[in-house]
């Protein structure tokens, strides 16, 4: 077992456990202080039930909303134009031990992307946008499919939905404290000073943002783990996923190569937040050059702190460390 994989798994486990335990401990302590133990625990349970119900509804029926928003069309094995895409996903699914091939969709949107989603009702699904099919070759699409199917195999949606309850719990608890302190003059617990409870509510809502950053950090780890999955399960997955990442970056941000030559590590991350008119063709030699630059790029720890994906240079360097094929 590669040590980098072991370290990544350990970090993910510690992050998940740490966010959960710290979040619940903070919420219970604050609720007990402001409202007393009995009412505080009841309030936390009520908030959890509320946000859990909302998340479950979103999870179960979200795939149908995604299909509507992205104007997706399902690809069948006999599709005369995109049947190759279904067979590609089927091959990668076999490498990853799937009993059934996830449903394959093409999304009619103007930016290159691929994503995995699903629910017990909708089943497992993977979608590719039209621009990404024009941008990448079949081997690169296969590597991207290895990444996306890794999300389904590792149940990342369910895990992040569960951990995401923590910042929501802290925020709504802060909301209760805010209005409770503002109108009731305090709670029933030890912290019966209305002004203090009001201030505590503001602090808790701010703290929820900090916990959201922690969840984003976990999300980046899961994305890195999906990269690892592609490298370890798809033949040629490392090199092809690296090229795919470079092509996607250059498609959305043609100046990225020149900036990285100048040792800039932050500007391109901001530009990728916006959906611009993507370039449909990126020369492979440009992508290879960008990959080589990324391999030696030193990325500040804060470069991707607000992002849900790791900085691409970090992804390239991790793939080099864990590749099997």
Swiss-Prot record:
<dbReference type="InterPro" id="IPR050083">
    <property type="entry name" value="HtpX_protease"/>
</dbReference>
<feature type="binding site">
    <location>
        <position position="151"/>
    </location>
    <ligand>
        <name>Zn(2+)</name>
    </ligand>
</feature>
<keyword id="KW-0378">Hydrolase</keyword>
<dbReference type="InterPro" id="IPR001915">
    <property type="entry name" value="Peptidase_M48"/>
</dbReference>
<dbReference type="GO" id="GO:0006508">
    <property type="term" value="P:proteolysis"/>
</dbReference>
<comment type="similarity">
    <text>Belongs to the peptidase M48B family.</text>
</comment>
<feature type="transmembrane region" description="Helical">
    <location>
        <begin position="41"/>
        <end position="61"/>
    </location>
</feature>
<dbReference type="GO" id="GO:0005886">
    <property type="term" value="C:plasma membrane"/>
</dbReference>
<keyword id="KW-0645">Protease</keyword>
<dbReference type="GO" id="GO:0008270">
    <property type="term" value="F:zinc ion binding"/>
</dbReference>
<keyword id="KW-1003">Cell membrane</keyword>
<keyword id="KW-1133">Transmembrane helix</keyword>
<keyword id="KW-0482">Metalloprotease</keyword>
<dbReference type="InterPro" id="IPR022919">
    <property type="entry name" value="Pept_M48_protease_HtpX"/>
</dbReference>
<protein>
    <recommendedName>
        <fullName>Protease HtpX homolog 2</fullName>
        <ecNumber>3.4.24.-</ecNumber>
    </recommendedName>
</protein>
<dbReference type="GO" id="GO:0004222">
    <property type="term" value="F:metalloendopeptidase activity"/>
</dbReference>
<feature type="binding site">
    <location>
        <position position="147"/>
    </location>
    <ligand>
        <name>Zn(2+)</name>
    </ligand>
</feature>
<feature type="transmembrane region" description="Helical">
    <location>
        <begin position="159"/>
        <end position="179"/>
    </location>
</feature>
<feature type="transmembrane region" description="Helical">
    <location>
        <begin position="10"/>
        <end position="30"/>
    </location>
</feature>
<keyword id="KW-0472">Membrane</keyword>
<keyword id="KW-0479">Metal-binding</keyword>
<keyword id="KW-0812">Transmembrane</keyword>
<keyword id="KW-0862">Zinc</keyword>
<dbReference type="Pfam" id="PF01435">
    <property type="entry name" value="Peptidase_M48"/>
</dbReference>
<feature type="active site">
    <location>
        <position position="148"/>
    </location>
</feature>
<feature type="binding site">
    <location>
        <position position="223"/>
    </location>
    <ligand>
        <name>Zn(2+)</name>
    </ligand>
</feature>
<feature type="transmembrane region" description="Helical">
    <location>
        <begin position="196"/>
        <end position="216"/>
    </location>
</feature>
